[in-house]
Amino acid sequence: MSLTTVKLLVLAPALALALAACNGDDVTGPTQAPENDDVAADVEAFCDDALGLGSPGEPEVDWETATEEEIAAAQQVFAEERLRPLVEDLRDSAPQDVQDDVATLEEALDEAEGSGDLEAFFGGAGGQARNAIAIEAADRCGWSSVDVTMVDYEFQGVPETLQAGPVVFSATNEGEESHEMIVFVKREGVEETWEEILGLEEAEVMERVEFVAATFAPAGEESTAAADLDPGEYVMVCFIPQGTDASGEEAGDGPPHFQEGMFADFTVE
C-alpha cells in the first residue's frame, strides 16, 4: 500500500488543530464546563466551530488523475464553499483574544480563493493563526487529550481504549526522521485485522476505512491533531518513506514507516 501522504496532509493542518495547551498525563479527561448558562452556550458555539474547522472534509478531486489546474480549481471551490463558512462561524463565536487570528484566516482564504492554493491557509501565518485558535479552544472546551511519542519506527503511549468524543492527540517526535500520524477508523462491517488491511492496495484500503485526522512533526518537534471520535476500531499510521530527512523536505526512497512497524491500533467506546 502506498497512500499519497501529500493528499492526506493537504487537510492535515485543519485536522491538526495544534492544541499545545493540552499537556499532562498520557490520557487526560475533559475539564469542568462553565456553570453559567449564557457563558456555557457561548463556549459551546466556539467549541463546535473550532471542531468543525478541524474536520472540514476535502476538495472534490481525483488526486491520482487530476491535472494541476483541476486540483487548483477544486481547492478554490473548497476554500469558497467549505472553509469560508467555517471561518465565518468562528468570526461570530470566537472570543476577542483570537479575533485577530480569525482575520488572518480570512485573509488567507482571500488568497486561496484567488489562486486555488491552500498553502496560505494551512501554513505560514494561517497555520500560526489556527494554532492560536486551537490553544484557546483547548483551554475553553475541555477536550480529552492523549500524549503520543513517535520514534523510529513506532508510536509509543497509545492507549488500548479511548472514550468517544472530542480528543486531542499530542505527538512528540523523538526519532531521527520526520514522522506523521494519520488516523483511520474501520468502516462498519469490516472484519479484517489492521495488518491485513494495510497490506492491501490503496483503493482496497480506502474501501475499508475512513480518514479521521492527521498531523506531521519533523524530528525533535511536536504537533497535534484533534478529532471527534465515534465508537469503533481505529489505527494511527506513518506513511513517510524510510530515509526521509529530519525536516521531511527530502523524501527517502525506502519502504513506508508502517512497514517497519509504525502503526498502532486502539478502540473507541
Please state what every model-predicted region is.
Residues A171-G175:
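Asparagine-centered strand-capping/turn motif at beta-strand->loop junctions
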Residues A18-A21:
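C-terminal motif of bacterial Sec signal peptides marking the signal peptidase cleavage site
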Residues S145-E154, L162-A164, E176, A213-E269:
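Extracellular/periplasmic metallocenter environments
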Residues N23-E44:
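Short, low-complexity, disordered segments immediately C-terminal to signal peptides
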Residues M1-V10:
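Bacterial N-terminal signal peptides that target proteins for export
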Residues A103-L109, G116-T149:
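Long amphipathic alpha-helical scaffold segments
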Residues P85-F122, V235, A246:
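Long, amphipathic, charge-rich alpha-helical segments that form helical bundles/coiled-coils
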Residues A45, D49-A94:
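Alpha-helical segments in soluble extracytoplasmic regions
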